[in-house]
Curated annotation (Swiss-Prot):
It is a multi-pass membrane protein. The keyword Membrane applies. The chain crosses the membrane at residues 104-124, 128-148, 174-194, 205-225, 237-257, 268-288. Bacitracin is thought to be involved in the inhibition of peptidoglycan synthesis by sequestering undecaprenyl diphosphate, thereby reducing the pool of lipid carrier available. Its main location: membrane. InterPro entries: UppP. The gene is uppP2. The keyword Cell cycle does not apply. NCBIfam families: PRK00281.2-1, undec_PP_bacA. This is Undecaprenyl-diphosphatase 2. PANTHER family: UNDECAPRENYL-DIPHOSPHATASE (PTHR30622:SF4).
Protein backbone atom coordinates (compact mmCIF):
# COMPACT_ATOMS: atom_id res chain seq x y z
CA UNK A 1 0.00 0.00 0.00
CA UNK A 2 1.33 3.44 -0.92
CA UNK A 3 2.05 5.80 1.99
CA UNK A 4 2.45 9.55 2.11
CA UNK A 5 5.99 10.84 2.39
CA UNK A 6 6.76 12.75 5.59
CA UNK A 7 8.68 16.01 5.75
CA UNK A 8 11.50 14.28 7.61
CA UNK A 9 11.85 11.83 4.74
CA UNK A 10 11.75 14.64 2.20
CA UNK A 11 14.52 16.60 3.90
CA UNK A 12 16.80 13.64 4.62
CA UNK A 13 16.45 12.10 1.17
CA UNK A 14 17.01 15.48 -0.50
CA UNK A 15 20.19 16.00 1.52
CA UNK A 16 21.38 12.54 0.44
CA UNK A 17 20.54 13.38 -3.19
CA UNK A 18 22.50 16.63 -3.07
CA UNK A 19 25.50 15.03 -1.38
CA UNK A 20 25.72 11.96 -3.59
CA UNK A 21 24.49 13.00 -7.06
CA UNK A 22 27.89 14.19 -8.26
CA UNK A 23 30.11 11.95 -6.18
CA UNK A 24 30.91 8.54 -7.71
CA UNK A 25 28.92 6.70 -5.05
CA UNK A 26 25.50 6.40 -6.79
CA UNK A 27 22.79 8.78 -5.59
CA UNK A 28 20.01 6.41 -6.70
CA UNK A 29 21.67 3.58 -4.79
CA UNK A 30 21.99 5.66 -1.62
CA UNK A 31 18.40 6.86 -1.83
CA UNK A 32 17.21 3.29 -2.32
CA UNK A 33 19.31 1.97 0.58
CA UNK A 34 18.60 4.67 3.15
CA UNK A 35 14.90 5.07 2.40
CA UNK A 36 14.49 1.33 2.94
CA UNK A 37 16.81 1.22 5.96
CA UNK A 38 15.21 4.16 7.77
CA UNK A 39 11.57 3.79 6.75
CA UNK A 40 11.21 0.29 5.39
CA UNK A 41 10.18 1.22 1.85
CA UNK A 42 11.56 2.62 -1.38
CA UNK A 43 10.90 6.33 -1.92
CA UNK A 44 10.38 5.54 -5.59
CA UNK A 45 12.21 6.21 -8.82
CA UNK A 46 9.97 9.14 -9.73
CA UNK A 47 10.64 11.09 -6.51
CA UNK A 48 14.34 10.46 -7.08
CA UNK A 49 14.16 11.70 -10.66
CA UNK A 50 12.25 14.86 -9.75
CA UNK A 51 14.56 16.02 -6.95
CA UNK A 52 17.43 15.37 -9.36
CA UNK A 53 16.18 18.51 -11.07
CA UNK A 54 17.57 20.40 -8.08
CA UNK A 55 21.04 19.00 -8.55
CA UNK A 56 20.67 19.51 -12.29
CA UNK A 57 19.93 23.19 -11.68
CA UNK A 58 23.10 23.30 -9.60
CA UNK A 59 25.08 22.12 -12.63
CA UNK A 60 23.39 24.69 -14.86
CA UNK A 61 24.27 27.51 -12.45
CA UNK A 62 27.81 26.29 -11.71
CA UNK A 63 28.69 25.81 -15.39
CA UNK A 64 26.51 28.66 -16.70
CA UNK A 65 29.38 30.34 -18.56
CA UNK A 66 30.54 27.10 -20.20
CA UNK A 67 26.98 26.16 -21.13
CA UNK A 68 26.32 29.59 -22.65
CA UNK A 69 29.53 29.48 -24.69
CA UNK A 70 28.77 25.97 -25.96
CA UNK A 71 25.11 26.64 -26.74
CA UNK A 72 25.89 29.97 -28.41
CA UNK A 73 28.68 28.55 -30.56
CA UNK A 74 26.56 25.53 -31.52
CA UNK A 75 23.57 27.65 -32.57
CA UNK A 76 25.76 30.01 -34.58
CA UNK A 77 27.61 27.08 -36.14
CA UNK A 78 24.36 25.41 -37.18
CA UNK A 79 23.21 28.73 -38.67
CA UNK A 80 26.44 28.91 -40.68
CA UNK A 81 25.79 25.38 -41.94
CA UNK A 82 22.21 26.23 -42.92
CA UNK A 83 23.46 29.36 -44.69
CA UNK A 84 25.89 27.22 -46.68
CA UNK A 85 23.02 24.98 -47.77
CA UNK A 86 21.28 27.96 -49.34
CA UNK A 87 24.37 28.69 -51.41
CA UNK A 88 25.34 31.78 -49.42
CA UNK A 89 28.79 30.71 -48.33
CA UNK A 90 30.04 32.82 -45.47
CA UNK A 91 32.54 32.56 -42.68
CA UNK A 92 32.89 29.30 -40.78
CA UNK A 93 34.31 30.78 -37.61
CA UNK A 94 31.93 29.10 -35.19
CA UNK A 95 32.00 25.68 -36.85
CA UNK A 96 35.75 25.64 -36.35
CA UNK A 97 35.52 26.45 -32.64
CA UNK A 98 35.94 23.93 -29.83
CA UNK A 99 32.67 25.02 -28.19
CA UNK A 100 30.76 24.14 -31.38
CA UNK A 101 32.32 20.68 -31.41
CA UNK A 102 31.60 20.30 -27.69
CA UNK A 103 27.93 21.01 -28.37
CA UNK A 104 27.81 18.10 -30.79
CA UNK A 105 29.80 15.90 -28.42
CA UNK A 106 27.27 16.46 -25.63
CA UNK A 107 24.37 15.74 -28.00
CA UNK A 108 25.95 12.56 -29.40
CA UNK A 109 27.06 11.42 -25.94
CA UNK A 110 23.50 11.81 -24.65
CA UNK A 111 21.86 9.65 -27.32
CA UNK A 112 22.73 6.21 -25.83
CA UNK A 113 21.27 6.92 -22.38
CA UNK A 114 18.27 8.72 -23.90
CA UNK A 115 17.36 5.69 -26.00
CA UNK A 116 18.06 3.05 -23.34
CA UNK A 117 16.47 5.11 -20.57
CA UNK A 118 13.26 5.56 -22.54
CA UNK A 119 13.02 1.99 -23.81
CA UNK A 120 14.03 0.46 -20.48
CA UNK A 121 11.98 2.68 -18.16
CA UNK A 122 9.74 -0.13 -16.89
CA UNK A 123 12.64 -2.55 -16.49
CA UNK A 124 14.59 -0.01 -14.45
CA UNK A 125 11.70 0.80 -12.13
CA UNK A 126 10.40 -2.73 -11.68
CA UNK A 127 13.56 -4.86 -11.62
CA UNK A 128 16.82 -2.94 -11.28
CA UNK A 129 15.91 -1.20 -8.01
CA UNK A 130 16.61 -4.44 -6.15
CA UNK A 131 18.92 -3.89 -3.17
CA UNK A 132 20.99 -6.96 -4.00
CA UNK A 133 21.79 -5.39 -7.37
CA UNK A 134 22.55 -2.03 -5.75
CA UNK A 135 24.87 -3.52 -3.13
CA UNK A 136 26.65 -5.72 -5.65
CA UNK A 137 27.30 -2.83 -8.03
CA UNK A 138 28.56 -0.63 -5.19
CA UNK A 139 31.25 -3.21 -4.53
CA UNK A 140 32.08 -4.39 -8.05
CA UNK A 141 32.22 -0.98 -9.70
CA UNK A 142 34.62 0.23 -7.02
CA UNK A 143 37.24 -1.99 -8.59
CA UNK A 144 36.55 -0.34 -11.96
CA UNK A 145 37.51 2.99 -10.34
CA UNK A 146 40.72 1.50 -9.03
CA UNK A 147 41.57 -0.12 -12.37
CA UNK A 148 40.82 3.09 -14.30
CA UNK A 149 43.09 5.09 -12.01
CA UNK A 150 45.91 2.57 -12.42
CA UNK A 151 45.62 2.17 -16.20
CA UNK A 152 44.76 5.73 -17.26
CA UNK A 153 47.69 8.01 -18.09
CA UNK A 154 45.65 11.17 -17.34
CA UNK A 155 47.53 13.20 -19.97
CA UNK A 156 44.84 14.51 -22.34
CA UNK A 157 43.43 18.02 -21.90
CA UNK A 158 39.90 19.38 -22.42
CA UNK A 159 40.80 20.66 -25.90
CA UNK A 160 41.77 17.11 -26.91
CA UNK A 161 38.31 15.63 -26.37
CA UNK A 162 37.01 13.91 -29.51
CA UNK A 163 33.71 12.58 -30.81
CA UNK A 164 35.00 9.07 -30.12
CA UNK A 165 35.45 10.01 -26.46
CA UNK A 166 31.89 11.34 -26.30
CA UNK A 167 30.44 8.14 -27.76
CA UNK A 168 32.36 5.89 -25.36
CA UNK A 169 31.58 8.05 -22.32
CA UNK A 170 27.98 8.30 -23.51
CA UNK A 171 27.61 4.53 -23.43
CA UNK A 172 29.34 4.48 -20.04
CA UNK A 173 26.68 6.89 -18.80
CA UNK A 174 24.10 4.19 -19.52
CA UNK A 175 25.54 2.21 -16.62
CA UNK A 176 24.07 4.86 -14.31
CA UNK A 177 20.64 3.39 -15.07
CA UNK A 178 21.67 0.60 -12.69
CA UNK A 179 21.50 1.79 -9.05
CA UNK A 180 24.87 1.38 -7.38
CA UNK A 181 27.02 2.23 -10.40
CA UNK A 182 26.97 6.07 -10.39
CA UNK A 183 26.65 8.37 -13.39
CA UNK A 184 29.88 10.23 -12.68
CA UNK A 185 31.61 7.00 -11.73
CA UNK A 186 30.78 5.39 -15.06
CA UNK A 187 31.64 8.36 -17.27
CA UNK A 188 34.76 9.46 -15.38
CA UNK A 189 36.11 5.89 -15.31
CA UNK A 190 35.61 5.69 -19.08
CA UNK A 191 37.40 9.02 -19.42
CA UNK A 192 40.33 7.78 -17.38
CA UNK A 193 40.58 4.64 -19.52
CA UNK A 194 40.72 7.04 -22.49
CA UNK A 195 43.71 8.74 -20.82
CA UNK A 196 41.86 11.98 -20.09
CA UNK A 197 43.04 14.12 -17.21
CA UNK A 198 40.89 13.35 -14.16
CA UNK A 199 39.55 16.91 -13.86
CA UNK A 200 38.81 17.01 -17.60
CA UNK A 201 36.87 13.75 -17.41
CA UNK A 202 34.93 15.07 -14.41
CA UNK A 203 33.98 18.38 -16.05
CA UNK A 204 32.85 16.64 -19.24
CA UNK A 205 30.91 14.15 -17.12
CA UNK A 206 28.93 17.04 -15.62
CA UNK A 207 28.20 18.58 -19.02
CA UNK A 208 27.18 15.20 -20.44
CA UNK A 209 24.75 14.59 -17.57
CA UNK A 210 22.78 17.81 -18.11
CA UNK A 211 20.43 16.73 -20.95
CA UNK A 212 19.89 13.22 -19.57
CA UNK A 213 19.07 14.20 -15.99
CA UNK A 214 16.94 17.17 -17.03
CA UNK A 215 14.89 15.02 -19.39
CA UNK A 216 14.57 12.25 -16.79
CA UNK A 217 13.28 14.63 -14.14
CA UNK A 218 10.78 16.38 -16.41
CA UNK A 219 9.59 13.07 -17.87
CA UNK A 220 9.01 11.67 -14.36
CA UNK A 221 7.29 14.76 -12.94
CA UNK A 222 3.71 13.58 -13.67
CA UNK A 223 4.48 10.10 -12.28
CA UNK A 224 5.73 11.53 -8.99
CA UNK A 225 2.11 12.16 -7.95
CA UNK A 226 0.99 8.68 -9.02
CA UNK A 227 0.10 6.14 -6.30
CA UNK A 228 2.11 3.54 -8.22
CA UNK A 229 5.38 5.51 -8.25
CA UNK A 230 6.53 4.78 -4.70
CA UNK A 231 5.73 7.01 -1.74
CA UNK A 232 3.35 9.86 -2.53
CA UNK A 233 5.01 13.28 -2.24
CA UNK A 234 3.10 16.55 -2.30
CA UNK A 235 3.94 19.42 -4.61
CA UNK A 236 5.35 21.37 -1.65
CA UNK A 237 7.58 18.46 -0.67
CA UNK A 238 8.89 18.09 -4.21
CA UNK A 239 9.63 21.83 -4.33
CA UNK A 240 11.46 21.90 -0.98
CA UNK A 241 13.31 18.68 -1.78
CA UNK A 242 14.45 20.08 -5.10
CA UNK A 243 15.65 23.30 -3.42
CA UNK A 244 17.65 21.39 -0.81
CA UNK A 245 19.17 19.16 -3.48
CA UNK A 246 20.17 22.28 -5.44
CA UNK A 247 21.98 23.98 -2.53
CA UNK A 248 23.81 20.88 -1.35
CA UNK A 249 24.52 19.76 -4.92
CA UNK A 250 26.15 23.09 -5.81
CA UNK A 251 28.50 22.77 -2.84
CA UNK A 252 29.27 19.17 -3.81
CA UNK A 253 30.29 20.17 -7.34
CA UNK A 254 32.69 22.82 -6.05
CA UNK A 255 34.20 20.37 -3.57
CA UNK A 256 34.55 17.49 -6.05
CA UNK A 257 36.35 19.57 -8.70
CA UNK A 258 38.88 20.67 -6.09
CA UNK A 259 39.22 17.12 -4.76
CA UNK A 260 39.86 15.41 -8.11
CA UNK A 261 42.59 17.90 -8.99
CA UNK A 262 44.89 16.15 -6.52
CA UNK A 263 43.15 12.97 -5.37
CA UNK A 264 42.28 9.63 -6.92
CA UNK A 265 38.71 8.50 -7.56
CA UNK A 266 39.75 5.24 -5.94
CA UNK A 267 39.32 6.90 -2.54
CA UNK A 268 35.56 6.63 -2.97
CA UNK A 269 35.91 2.85 -2.95
CA UNK A 270 36.64 3.14 0.78
CA UNK A 271 33.00 4.16 1.25
CA UNK A 272 31.36 2.14 -1.51
CA UNK A 273 32.78 -1.28 -0.66
CA UNK A 274 31.97 -1.29 3.10
CA UNK A 275 28.49 0.11 2.39
CA UNK A 276 27.80 -2.52 -0.25
CA UNK A 277 29.01 -5.33 1.99
CA UNK A 278 26.99 -3.98 4.93
CA UNK A 279 23.82 -3.92 2.83
CA UNK A 280 24.49 -7.48 1.65
CA UNK A 281 24.81 -8.55 5.28
CA UNK A 282 21.57 -6.82 6.29
CA UNK A 283 19.80 -8.46 3.36
CA UNK A 284 21.22 -11.89 4.18
CA UNK A 285 20.03 -11.67 7.80
CA UNK A 286 16.62 -10.36 6.84
CA UNK A 287 17.04 -6.92 8.38
CA UNK A 288 16.43 -5.36 4.96
CA UNK A 289 14.11 -6.57 2.24
CA UNK A 290 15.39 -6.39 -1.33
Amino acid sequence: MTTDMTWAQTIILSLIQGLTEFLPVSSSGHLRIFSTLLWGEDAGASFTAVIQLGTELAVLVFFAKDIWNIASAWCKGVWEWLTDLTGKHGRRVHRQSFDYRMGWMVIVGTLPVAVLGYLGKDLIRDNLRNLWITATMLVLFSFVFILAERMGRRERSFDELTMRDSVIMGFAQCLALIPGVSRSGGTVSAGLFLNLDREVATRYSFLLAIPAVLASGLFSLPDAFSPDAGQAASGAQLFVGTAIAFAVGYASIAWLLKFVANHSFAWFALWRIPLGLAVMGLLAFGVLQA
